[in-house]
Amino acid sequence: MAQQQQQQHNHQTSNNNNNNSSILLLQQQQLHQEQLQQYNNNLYSQNYNMEEYERRKRREREKIERQQGIQIDDRETSLFGEPRRLTEADADITAALGEFGDARVYINQSTVGISRHTPGAGNPRLQAPLQPPPKSLGHSPSYTGSTGSASASANSAVPSQQQQQQHYNGTGGRFLPPAASKRSSSGAGQQPLPQEKDISKMISEMADNFRVTPLTSIAATPHAPVRENYNLNGPNKNKYMDDIISSPLSQPSSLMTPLFAPIAPIASPPQTSQLPLGGATSLTGSSEAVLGLAPLQQLPPTPPKAASAITSPAAAKPLKTEKNHTLEKQDSCLENDLELSESEDEQPKKEGRSAGNSSNSSESDSSESGSESSSKNDAQPLPNHKLHHQQQQQLQQQPLQQQQHQQQQQQQILLQQQQQQRPQQLTANGKSEKKKYKHAIIAGGSNTITGLLTSSGFGSGGNGGPGGNSCGPGSGASASAGTMSSGGSSSNKTPSPTESNKWTLSRFFPKPANQTNTESATPGNVSMKVPGILPGGAQIIPEPIEVSTAIVKNEKIHDDPMDMDDGEEDDDDEDQQQQQQQQLHYRADLSVTPVSVKKEAIDGVSELGLAAIPKNQIKRESSEALHASRLSDSGTSGSSSSSSSSSESAPGGEVVPMPGPGETLQIPGGAAITSVMRVPPTLTQKAPSSTSVTLMPILPLPMSPKQRQKKQRKKKTSTPIVNSSDEDEPAPKHPGLDYTAVSAHSQSTATAPAKKRGRPRKQQQQSGGSGNLSSASAGSSSQTKGPTLTAAKKPLCKALPAMGGARKRDHSSQSSSNGNTPTKKMATPMSVSAPPKTASVHRDSSSSDDDSSSSGGSSSKSSSSSSSSDDTEEAQNTNCRIVKLNKTGAGAVAAKVLLGSGSSSALSSGSEAEDQARSQAGSGKALAQQMPPYKPQVMSQHSQQLSSSECSSSSGDRGGTGAGSSSSGEEDEARHEKERERKPKSDKNKISTLTRIFNPKEGGAKKQGQVVIMDLQEEQQQGKLDAATQSSQIPATAPAVKPRMTPTQQLQQQHAQSQQMLGTSLASPARTTTPHLTSLICKIDLSKLSRERIMRLKKLTPAQQNGHLTPKGQAASAVQMPNGYANDAVPAAKVKPEHPVKPEPDADYEAKFKPGSVKQEFQLKQERDRDRERERERDREQPPGRRRKRSSSSSSSPYKEKKRKKEKTDQLQICKELLPSNNHERIPNHDRLSYDKLQLLHEDAAAAAAASGVGAAPNGSPRKNLLAMSPLPPPPISTAIAIVPPITCNEAVQTTPPLTTSTSPQAASAVTEPAPPAVAVPPAPVTRLIYRSYFDREEAHPSADLRRNNQFLQEAVNRKHAADAEPDSFNQVTLYLEAVVYFLLTADAMERCSSEATYTMYKDTLSLIKFISFKFRPQHSANGQTKTHMAKVAILSLRCQSLISLKLYNLRRANCRDIIASLTDFFRTGRGDIVNGNTPSSISPSNSVGSQGSGSNTPPGRIVPRDIHNQLSKQNEYLSYVHSAHELWDQADHSVRKGNHTDFFRELDHENGPLTLHSTMHEVFRYVQAGLKTLRDAVSHTAHPTQ
């Protein structure tokens, strides 16, 4: 029965194959001409790809390694290991490689379905003509299908084989059956292409010849970049399968179905390039795979031109889409840089990307979150494909008849669908075309990448894949989008042709209809400055360099929001997924990233076209409907693609369907780091005034795509810079943009990431999965200070249309550091509890993003996740005001607004969802209370939005956060605490990611700005320690203090905000005369990570502020002052100017002018480190209770500060009165100290006094010791002063507590309160190290008593003889050295009697010590301890030799002086005969050969008189002593350091005085004797224990 069934099944399969073949042949014949034309147009692409293979392969490999941080393990080996196993088909493969024509002929004639994978498939052009008969695309599909349906065995193996194909592992007959099964799953009938050969024969032929070989061969061929780039055998094989539509890798991996792989490649190219072939791409079932293959084989993928011809409307879109991709290519470097951060995220992405194209990695890089979603999408299609495969397998498992029947039905249905789709595409008009095109692109992307891969790569996936993936939209759309999808998916890099595709690379690069072949440029050759079309059909649109300044993760391109609104929501899901995949592929394949598309893509793009910008990029849709549609689209798209993207806030996270031909897909210049969320970002420019809160309605962004593209992406990138400052403040706060609502939408997706925000790139938005550096560091917003590389580019946001306008909110402000006042989009009402968590996730990224892109991103996310929220947000969005809180002056208003934002701030602050929820609850209320004035527009529901503005205003970063925290006080504090607790986890990952991203070597800086990576985590960690104190203080002080005075903020802002202010001033063109860098300077302080705790532990270290060594705890302890400083309490007037008491300078002043903050990026690394160290010391020494986060000045611009200064003139006067006049002179910045700050300072000091009174003494003691040791005397400090803890001013400036002498009652009270404890603890006496003066040397010489001198000599002689007889080496050398020093004493005594005898004694002693020096070398048998002691003795010997040599010179110095004078005269006058010169000589002047040969002649020279010669000899001797003295001394020093004997000699120096070249012989004697005694004691001590 089984055999009969099998035979019947085979028969049915053959019939089905025949039917399918006839159908397919008709379709193929119809499409053949089109494809052939396309092929002709794209053939150049193939050649180009082949030529560029090595270079592209190398580049892709490097990129992947760099991006993933993963070293590709023997990818080539893995790739070629399996592929290299060539069967007898080697000759054929070789022919294919060498001669495509021959290979093609062979395949066409002898095989049914391998045209692509078989060597013959190599030449698409050759194949194209032959395709009709073998069009066996059929080869792959028909072969596979035939095989699968033709042979029962194939069918039996089909299910497993299909899976095996996916696994890529599988060779031999098993793959063959899978091929068949794949085919069958595709649909047996799809095989019309095969030339009705006996299917069994064809299958056997393929199995025998091509089973392993075709795929393997292709994979092995150097021309298979994809293969080479990816390890097919490795764990990533699935990745390749998913991503590669042709998925030669996955299919090759399933060598069993070389046909499949070819089919898949063919299918994918046809879908991409052949989308025009509605039927071909539409062959969802096996027919699709077959047609896909057939079109691919028959028609090289139609160049974009051909594709456009087939589907003119769609084609136009693909062109633009490709154009975007081409632009993406431009940003590949950025992508690469960004890719570094996605190391963890990449794998999933890679799996999705790498299979299809190396471009996948590029795309994932361009938009991590986008790539994640795309990978998710790929994964989803893959599951679909898998489902199809499984279903098909099941069908195959079912009675063969039923299976065949079903397959036939499926094929017919697929054909019908394809035909319908094709007409639809052709007939599609306007929006429908756009939609379909979008779908085509998306479907093409999914189909091409996932769909194709699914369909052709997975067999049944072929049927279901195209149908399922592109399903209604689009097989046909896929064809029209084919240009784009082929360019995007398979030609992302151009490149990596699938194995089947390998030789028909042009398929992957369909050219736009209007494009000529010459227009395509190789990635290497592509000049982004010159307009052109890449092989993939991507158009290169030259953009200003500034556009690329942002590190941009390529964002997914969305179709017009309108189209989406029109009902493309469903399509959008698929489209977005597909597009994301495509874009990922494009980005990977095309060196240009979509960012490049910014300008040109926008041409002809309507506002909707702009709306097509990825949702993440679009800050806000101007219309709710559009927004809602997007939300639904992204949500439908399986919120996995758009939701996850939005939640990830990856630029490409949400992919709006590619704009239709009319809708130029605009990729905003948004940084890959920060994708602008659709939530309308407030485009608030700079906060108008530091003291005022400016609410500005967000206008729709200008449609000009260029601006928007530039600004959004770049801004996103630059936004991180603002974030860097913002991040300094509990970064999460402002990130708490009203992302709550936004978060709410994307919450499902984002919520999970929220926890993972620690992982910068991987996590969706927060992690930086959004591709935002800021997102990555958003979790540790303080860490990700500097993602705002491109923040300066405000114009981008302007370019955005209304929806862009929503985004606009942050971008312009973000672009300038200060400008980051993106109004929190009116997020969906705080009511959403889950959103808060998401918001926190968003917040993480947004805090990185500086709220602008981040808030925008989260808004977009939320909109995508929940259309309702999005709609609300959108409506609000329109109403959204950009609230810029000038944190400084905003005081009450800021507090109110920030309060509302405080909740979002809590979210943004990096608090977990719980914090966010709590914040939302509290801040929602506070918002209702505080926000009412602003509420009318949108704020009612979006308390977070205000918070967003709070966070967004970079100048207000800390101030805003401060306001929010003061208003929400306890909540903020709690959030900060939690934030600090959590940040250490996420911050580390984010920091590493940011570091890599911004590493100039990685191209992160991109000459777009300087990225200073600084870690504020230290402050946050300290905040944890101080949390309890702060929690108590903050509620009390917050109301009294301006929002920017929030203690936590004050601390973080002190460091980060001043940096931010710096960056902002540079970044904000409006505010600053300084030309803004292309991107803001990102300041990410990583240094504080590890040091904080260490520094905290080391409170002993004197705090160095402004270069002063004033210990922070110094106030607590009165230190004994060396050098005549008064130890007792000293009036303030007596304070040394070098250690003035410094009031806390104005926050703005510090931010602007503080040395540490001003242009830190330009400071030397050492200087920055020193400043940071000082700041950390101040922070650690500051009691936690006193730790106040200095609120950053609301405005970063200098003139705002000036204005503030004027306003504070009265306060300054008061401060001056409070401070000593000398201090004023010393500290100009104290003038900027605000009275309220001073008051707070006093209060803090008083509060700290109680706590510090007890600890003052302990801290003082260590400090005292350090001071005593320090070369600089500590400044005199009164006891009262000591009690008052010094207050840390903003970053660089530390204010010492006001002296007790200060007249101010407040100061007096502050001092007096702590005074009693200070008095109670008298300063402990400080041990003074006494160093001898050179002139204090002992002048007393031993008596000239001859008996004493003789005694020294006798001692020396005795020791010398004892040493000669000593058997022990150590004792011998010590005795010799003792004899030497006694000889030195004798010589020194003799010096008074006879200098000549003394000289002789020293000289003999030197000879003796040199003679015995060899004994200092330890014997090999000596133990380690003995060797060490011997080495020390040798060092002492070297010292003695050096001093003896110098002594010998000194004894002859007078003679040497005379000799030098005589010789100088001789050489000056030139007296002396010149040999062979002017004077006659006995030597013949001739230089004849004869005379020279005789040897009687000497070379020309001067005759030196004998006396001069003798003098020269003496001089040489004397000067050699000087030389030897210094050489021997240096040798001794080197030995000390080399042997780690510094401690030993340091101790000797302390006990006996340092030994120098000026030491007397008595000092030498004492020093050496002490050293020898110590060594003997050590030896005897070690010897006794052993005994």
From Swiss-Prot:
GO process terms (BP): periodic partitioning by pair rule gene; regulation of cytoskeleton organization; regulation of DNA-templated transcription; regulation of lipid transport
Gene: lilli
Main localization (coarse): nucleus
Compositional bias ranges of the Basic residues kind: 707-717
Stretches with biased composition (Acidic residues): 334-345, 562-576
InterPro entries, alphabetized: AF4/FMR2, AF4/FMR2_CHD
Region (Disordered): 1-20, 115-194, 296-539, 551-593, 606-880, 902-996, 1049-1073, 1130-1213, 1297-1317, 1477-1506
GO molecular function annotations of the record: DNA binding; transcription coregulator activity
Protein name per the record: AF4/FMR2 family member lilli
Function description: Has a role in transcriptional regulation. Acts in parallel with the Ras/MAPK and the PI3K/PKB pathways in the control of cell identity and cellular growth. Essential for regulation of the cytoskeleton and cell growth but not for cell proliferation or growth rate. Required specifically for the microtubule-based basal transport of lipid droplets. Plays a partially redundant function downstream of Raf in cell fate specification in the developing eye. Pair-rule protein that regulates embryonic cellularization, gastrulation and segmentation.
Stretches with biased composition (Low complexity): 140-169, 305-318, 354-426, 476-496, 629-663, 763-802, 853-869, 902-911, 940-956, 1049-1060, 1297-1313, 1477-1497
Family of the protein in this entry: Belongs to the AF4 family.
Alphabetized Pfam families for the sequence: AFF4_CHD
Biased composition (Basic and acidic residues): 319-332, 973-990, 1135-1153, 1162-1184
GO CC annotation, single: nucleus
